Amino acid sequence: DAKGNEDFAAADSTSTFNAVSLSSGAVYQLDPIWSLAANLGYTERAPTFYELYANGAHVATGAYEVGDASLNKEKAIAADLALRFDNGTHKGSVGVFYSHFRNYIGLISSGNLREGHHHDGDDDHDHDHGDIPEYLYQGVRARFYGIEAQDRWQLLENRYGSFALELSGDYTRANNLDTGEPLPRIAPLRLNSGLLWSLERWQARVDVQHAASQQRKPSNETSTDGYTTLGASVGYRFDVGQSQWLAFVRGENLTNQTVRYASSILRDIAPAPGRSVEVGLRTSF
């Protein structure tokens, strides 16, 4: 509605954006096992309608979001460099990445509270849901950089099955160059490991995921504690006619840890689910 409503501001003008993206990449083979991979790119992204015109309480995020109709395109130059190896039974990579934004569009806390309302269809009876934090869609200069690594090692294969180990990790630093503070909701150091087993139609895996605490945040945001979770699954594949099926049991966060994702705007009011067990049947045609 161009006239606006309780969730979106009035729009008395038309916004038109032409976004372009360019990228190039290369791989240099050092020897039969080792190689270098590099990528360079330039991207533009047009702001979405809610980044431009939001002006109300967002039920899903528990925030009062305010857009900016004057936002320009998001523009970024990005580069990454990775060292890869693959000897058949053992393969992985370690790499670094860097991105510079001229106009990073982020949802940034103003530090203020706004009154949230819900309408139940009766204009004479608004139900006050109390004060909720205000977040502004803003375009800022920003810098992202970090490191990431992954590894898969085929441990052994015998009559008892095939065993493999998967390892991965990543770390990102992101700064608001306009304020000098860290950007909000950036994931901390994350480390993952998984032990995989398969034998004929059977498969199973055990995963351990660790996230460090996140203390790098704007002054008006909260930090998050680190956590380590355990997951496990077992599955059996079978065929029905021309269809392939998988019956599985999967457990997540089996140690029932309190997990608050640093990247979630709801982290202070809604932690991630605790212990869960799922039984399922999946097919592909």
Regions found by a protein language model. Name each.
Residues 44-45, 102, 213-216, 236-285:
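C-terminal beta-signal and adjacent terminal beta-strands/loops
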